[in-house]
Amino acid sequence: MKVVGLLLAGGQSRRMGGGDKALRMLGGTTLLERVIERLRPQVDALLLNANGDPSRFARFALPVVPDSIPGFGGPLAGVLAGLDWAAAQGPDYPYIVSVATDAPFLPDDLVMRLTNGLMEAGADLACAASGGRVHPVFGLWPVRLREDLRRAMVDDEIRTVDPVDRAPSLDDGAFRRHASRPVFQRKPAQGF
C-alpha cells in the first residue's frame, strides 16, 4: 500500500502570534525540516498543505497545495486538499497520512502503527492516540472517502473531528472510536 505523507501547515498560527509555525526554528532547524526528516522514510511521497504564497516553501522542493475549500479553515480542509492531490495522481496512492508540522517529534513508526491499527480493526480511518487522548490530525485517510469528507464539510459544516466532544458518535454515528485501539471506523453504509 503506497501512502502520501501530508504535512499540514495551512493554519494561521494565532496562538503563536501568526506567521508560519512550520518555519519556526528549533535547535537551528525549522519544525518543517524536522517533521520531513521523521516522515519521509515512512511514506512514498510528501506533500505540503499551506495557504498563501507557496514560494516561501520552495527550498523544501515539495508540491504545495492550498486548502480545497477556500476560507474554510481547520485541518480538515488541509486533509481534503491532500486527498484531492492524491486522487489526481491516479490509483497509485490510495491513502494519505496527515501530520501537523508543529510536532517535530512524531514517531518513526507512525505510519506502520496507523496502518496496523486500521487493518486490525477493519476500519476505514485511523488516527493516533497518546496519554488517553486521540489526535485526529495524525491520521491515515483513504482517498476513496474524499467526496464523503467534502460533503460533510460543505453540507453539514463539519470543521473538526473532535473525538473528545463527539465520540463515540461523530456525525450521527458515521464514526465511532474502537474501544481498545486509537482508530475511528466508518461503516460503508453510513455517511461521513
Regions found by a protein language model. Give the residues of each.
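Nucleotide and nucleotide-moiety/phosphate-recognizing core
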Residues: 1-158, 166-179, 183
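Acidic, Mg2+-coordinating catalytic module of metal-dependent nucleases/exonucleases
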Residues: 189-192
